[in-house]
């Protein structure tokens, strides 16, 4: 497969065309961003860690019936993925209250929620990725119909039901995570983007030590060490 011109560059990845019009190469970057890219940094090797972590998680999800865009991983930082039309919604699944949820609703940080909360944000950096509801999704034509909203929520909850016990077995608490979904040329909804410490909050099961991008957001240090620890636990 031939890697051709760059199609898109985001905060954490670059997408390249290939000689197959239905496939792209996704390259993971070492860049770190927070607060809608107002805070920026770089951690050598982070891209490779996220690529490995996301590959392992996507394979786990596929074995459990979740369709993804991943075709194969071809280098330390590169994946071949199906070309998708990304649904312009960030889907957030929360198991424990922290971050923006505590600020918006006054819930005490660390509160275990009675059930997984699924939230939507509009994918629009200029607007600050605002929170939106089902009706917004329909009014803005972000989805095809109400049935697709239900499909998105059901997929998000199923992913959570697979990952929460998996990570618990690795002595990690899956606090919350963000996913992006895409539509293939056959209009099939698939998990796209990545699942990694860039897009998840992981706390150690016993100490509640943060092992994710919050270490960068909150200037806790040892970002790479935390990502390495997550990968180590996934592989063990």
UniProtKB/Swiss-Prot annotation:
Cysteine disulfide partners in this protein: none
PANTHER family (alphabetical): MULTIFUNCTIONAL PROTEIN ADE2 (PTHR43599), SI:DKEY-6E2.2 (PTHR43599:SF3)
A Pfam family hit: SAICAR_synt
Catalytic activity: 5-amino-1-(5-phospho-D-ribosyl)imidazole-4-carboxylate + L-aspartate + ATP = (2S)-2-[5-amino-1-(5-phospho-beta-D-ribosyl)imidazole-4-carboxamido]succinate + ADP + phosphate + 2 H(+)
Keyword ATP-binding in annotation: yes
Source taxon at top rank: Bacteria
One GO BP: cobalamin biosynthetic process
Protein name: Phosphoribosylaminoimidazole-succinocarboxamide synthase
Organism: Campylobacter jejuni subsp. jejuni serotype O:23/36 (strain 81-176)
